[in-house]
């Protein structure tokens, strides 16, 4: 009996655990694809976030006065995606920042501005700003924070006690300056105006975005300010 033992495989019947992971298994017939590698695309909703208790993420409606408490729910509101990134201890800055270190009241106002309906260009409406992204690589916390804030047209500011945010959005005027309430210089010209050069004023941009109607591939679209082009060229 000249039996030669080469190797063996042990099969252990246990239930594996994949914490903090969305795991998908797909079984396909190899005859349908031949030698080609199977590619898959998934439409994900992402993490369950902490959102205001008076907020309905599905309808984007706010009821009553917010008492400052939060509840778990799915949302693509940019402000609360930022809150999750700042306060989560596993993937975010939660080990450095606590809930009391982030100005949630400023994020509440910013989140309402993000939820306002604006024309979508096709006769309907859509939320002003949404976040449908996933973080796949480790980066510096400040870089990720800056990317989130730039998408909402806001800036992070440390006021000495908390991390707060200042957003570029329409608001009531704070003060009116005119010749009667400013110090008049010797030359008699209290106000001096400066402008950017015409060549520095951009009126066309190319936007890269994920097109769901084209297999979720990256598409490029040109967006132009036709009025500025007609005026300045």
Where are these regions (language model features)?
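Polar, S/T/G-rich
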Residues: 1-150, 159, 215
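Surface-exposed, non-catalytic interaction/assembly patches
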Residues: 9-33, 132, 166-233
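A structural signal for short hydrophobic beta-strand segments in well-ordered beta-sheet cores
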Residues: 154-156
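Hydrophobic residues embedded in beta-strands of well-ordered beta-sheets
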Residues: 161-164
């Amino acid at each position: 009996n000249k039996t030669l033992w080469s190797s063996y495989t042990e099969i252990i019947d246990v239930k594996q655990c994949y914490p903090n992971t969305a795991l998908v298994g797909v079984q396909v017939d190899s005859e349908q694809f031949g030698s080609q590698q199977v590619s898959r695309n998934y439409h994900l909703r992402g993490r369950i976030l902490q959102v205001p208790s008076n907020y309905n993420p599905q309808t984007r409606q706010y009821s009553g006065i917010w008492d400052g408490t939060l509840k778990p729910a799915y949302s693509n509101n940019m402000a609360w995606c930022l809150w999750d990134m700042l306060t989560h201890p596993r993937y975010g800055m939660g080990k450095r920042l606590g809930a009391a270190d982030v100005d949630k009241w400023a994020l509440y106002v910013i989140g309402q501005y993000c939820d306002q309906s604006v024309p979508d260009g096709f006769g309907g409406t859509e939320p002003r700003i949404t976040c449908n992204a996933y973080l796949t690589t480790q980066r510096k916390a400040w870089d990720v924070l800056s990317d989130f804030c730039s998408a909402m047209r806001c800036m992070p500011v440390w006021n000495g006690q908390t991390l707060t945010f200042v957003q570029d959005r329409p608001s009531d005027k704070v003060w009116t300056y005119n010749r009667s309430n400013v110090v008049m210089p010797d030359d008699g010209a209290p106000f001096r105006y400066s402008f950017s050069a015409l060549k520095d004023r951009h009126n066309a941009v190319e936007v890269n975005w994920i097109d769901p109607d084209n297999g979720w591939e990256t598409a490029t679209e040109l967006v132009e300010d036709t009025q500025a082009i007609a005026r300045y060229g």
